[in-house]
Amino acid sequence: MASSRAQRFNPIAFTPWPVTCITTIVYLALLIPILVINLVVPSAPETNPKGVNLTEAWRDLQHLTGGFHPYNSRRNDEVHEWLLSRINSIIRPTVEAGQRSSATDNLPEVFVFDDNRSNLTYSNGGVGKTSIVGVYFESTNIIVYIRGSEDDLENWWERSNGKPKGKGGVLVNAHYDSVSTGYGATDDGIGVVSLLQLLRYFTTPGNNPRKGLVLLFNNGEEDYLNGAHVFSQHPLSNFTHTFLNLEGAGAGGRAALFRTTDTEVTRFYGNTKHPFGSVLAADGFKMGLLRSQTDYVVFNGILGLRGLDLAFIAPRSRYHTDQDDTRHTSIDSLWHMLSASIGTTEGLVSYTGMDFDGKSKDQNKVNSGAGTLGVWFDMFGTAFAVFRLHTLFAISVALLVIAPLVIFVTNRMYLFSMSKSLEGTGDQVSLRGLRGFSRTPIILVTATTIPICLAYLLEKVNPYIVHSSQFSVWSMMFSAWIFLAWFLACAADFFRPSALHRAYSYTWIFIATWIMLVINTVYANQKGIAAGYFLLFYFAGAFLATWISYLELFALPRKGDFARQTTGRRPSSLSSRLLTSSADELRSNASPSTAEFPGAAGEDTDPTESTSLLRGQRTTFANYRTSGPGGAAEETDEREDINKGGTFEHEQSWSWTLPRWTWVLQLLLLAPIVLILVGQLALFLTASMCQVGSDGVSTFVVYLACAVFTTLLCIPLFPLIHRFTYHIPTFLFLVFIGTLIYNLVAFPFSPANRLKTFFIQEVDLDNGSNTVSLTGIQPYLTDAINSIPSAAGQNITCDKTTPFGKLERCSWSGLSPNVLGQGRERDTEIVPDKWITYNITKTVGKNKARIEISGRNTRACKLKFDRAVANFQVSGSAVDHRMPPTSRQGVAEIRLWSRTWENTWVVDINWHESADESDDDDDDDEKHDAPQNVLSGKAICMWSDANQPGVIPALDEVRLYAPSWIAISKAADGLVEASHSFTIQ
């Protein structure tokens, strides 16, 4: 009998060891590649592709990031001149070849515009009754135009009011300014050197663009998207219809596509070899969950261009800090963005269709046509899926209707059946078909509650551990969910075993995903939200897995046949010992011997011509051969085989004919699609959000997202988990204990994952006070300040009056800054006239005034008012009706930026007598002289150049003495702000 049992071993049977091994292999085979994709950047090619020089690009990046280069710094001017030199060196061979060639049609014309003329006054538009911020900015953008082979040959921009003809061109944008506290390797140095390589690529013979290509090296993005705004005043802004914006919101890794305008333009990103990104991030912006903005909002929202946002998203702890340098990124990251830029741009400039040249609905925007909302995501970093949101909606509606109908019309047989009545006698035969029906929702809710409780626990005890240990958090939640679900499922199976556990589990999963898909479909239709696209595939997999469970039931005998057989009323020729019920399933008075072996008496008949060669045997739906009732000599041993090869342990006896391999098919239909789509989303989300706590965002959102995604990823395991052996759950329980202890007691920051704090030094020129402030999260902020020598022994004042959520701002009297430039006296004493000069002239009898302001060794100042002014105008400024400088809310602050150092701005302002009055230049003199006509505020200038040690000693001191797990970033436009108070009456 041993050899017989060995032959019956099935490596894919629904028994503990096959289930444990196969399920583990499937999950590891999918999760490991997903982890690799999110953690490892594809290698750059060893040899340069045609038209690209990666070595040159890396050297350019190293030069660009040799110092801090914010707009308000001398090094920014050096970078500007260096870029012009690099551009000219790249296009020089093309220009010289064109001059020597008689057939210049094959060589693209290249035009370089050093835009030092454009300026603009605009505002942020305001929200509700909030006063807006007005901005005046002078351009230092560099614009390169590569004429396409199908472009108008006329230099139309040289004519006044000249307009382009033909199809619109393509804009690729990156900003060459950095923040004052970061070297800007990924924000946005890689974008800048990618533009240089795009220039080289499209001026290489054979790579000529069909449509014109505009490369915008914009300056001033970090402070208020100023460079993109002022680009709107250049003639080429009317030529481009599509765009690709290169950005950085992290400091390395892969460049992610995290926002696009429509389906049609997104398809061109599919040309890249290593796509990466999801529509989830785009919907985060749409729903207001992500508040930081890029030049994308200017190109699309104001100019009406259609395009894509490509950016680095992690790690945010290095973003805007001194670790955003070439040491902490790689040539692989550079190649990932560059290759995506080349693939996308090449597709856009080669496109000959009319999708991007239709009439615009807004006459103030370019005629770029109208796109459709899209759904897009990558798969394993090698394939890219993109389709219309309307397609998602239509398929979702169809599946929501068809799937339940298919399930409903499929014969459920033993499902939901407790017993079967015998015809004629009325006897009830127990089927136990409802056993296992209610356990799934109870266990799933319990298992899901645990990660949510853990999220609350971490938020209360150690809220920032995810900052440096996101995978420890993931491991804790995964192990807790799986162990608890396994324990409860095994307990339920022990006390009430059921062969229908899998069918009921898939049914509940089907119901839950159906509800979620309904909600997602409503949001997709009404709000245009596509982030739940994975639910369509999740539901489709759940539907197919559920349907298979229902189709399995066709392998069972009919309930009536089983009932008659258990009471001995079926003919012996149709009977089988393997359909025997246990004693507690029989509610009739039939004798056990008759019920168990109803055909024993008539089995030894003589064979005839019609007798089967496999006499006494039958084949089940699962292709298991079972013996019929043979001789009494082997009855005991054969009964033992039946128990091992038929029903599993104490499950319903009618279940022996159920297929034993279909669980593998169900696993493969549901688990891979869930792991691929949901797994990538989970890692993408946590990688981009795990370090937002240092920005004042609640980390509970991150932990809650981990808990939800843990459940979504583990649900495909649940129908099978009661068959697991104890080995893996026990191991995971130990993992849970270890990671829980670590997550509760470990210090959340490290030199590789630093806590970001925000620095500013404010000098009050009225009283000579000098205040240094750091903004961050407590109690870590206090620990950092206690390590600073100049703060020792001082009364540190802290408050939460910041716009950054949970952050606190702590201040003390700091070291005096030396920002007035070389050749001037050291600023050990605050002399107001050396810092800012300003003059205010009020118009007699009116609520009008002219303010002249200038700062020493700076080109950035601002005016802040205690109450909003109605209107303002900067002398010599252009105004664009698409971006009005004021609104009915009024202007509370005016920011002034100049391309010229120590420039004097002349600003005319007027203000209302009260918040309810409209502007009226003919108001009575008595009203204007009344106290309510008094306007007070501050004249402020800013300094942002920290390249030389000793210029801002307080900043040098913080960097030198702060703990290694502290990073310093800017708190405002300037590192140092000096202010004068004024009153106009």
Swiss-Prot record:
Q: Give a yes or no for keyword Glycoprotein in this entry.
A: yes
Classification via Gene3D superfamilies: Zn peptidases
Task: Say where the protein is mainly found.
Answer: membrane
EC number(s): the record gives: 3.4.-.-
Which residue spans belong to the Cytoplasmic compartment?
1-20, 410-440, 492-502, 549-666, 722-727
Q: Where is this site: Transition state stabilizer?
A: 319
Record family assignment: Belongs to the peptidase M28 family.
Q: Where is this region: Disordered?
A: 563-612
What is this protein's function per UniProt? May be involved in vacuolar sorting and osmoregulation.
Q: One Pfam match, by short name?
A: PFF1_TM
UniProt-annotated binding residues for Zn(2+) 2: 187, 222, 320
Transmembrane annotation, as ranges: 21-41, 389-409, 441-461, 471-491, 503-523, 528-548, 667-687, 701-721, 728-748
Q: Which cofactor does it need?
A: Zn(2+)
Protein's UniProt name: Vacuolar membrane protease
Glycosylation annotated at which residues? 53, 116, 119, 238, 767, 795, 839
Kindly state one GO CC term assigned in the UniProt record: vacuolar membrane
**Location of this chain's protein in the cell:** Vacuole membrane
The residues on the Vacuolar side of the membrane are 42-388, 462-470, 524-527, 688-700, 749-985
Q: Which residues form the active site?
A: 221
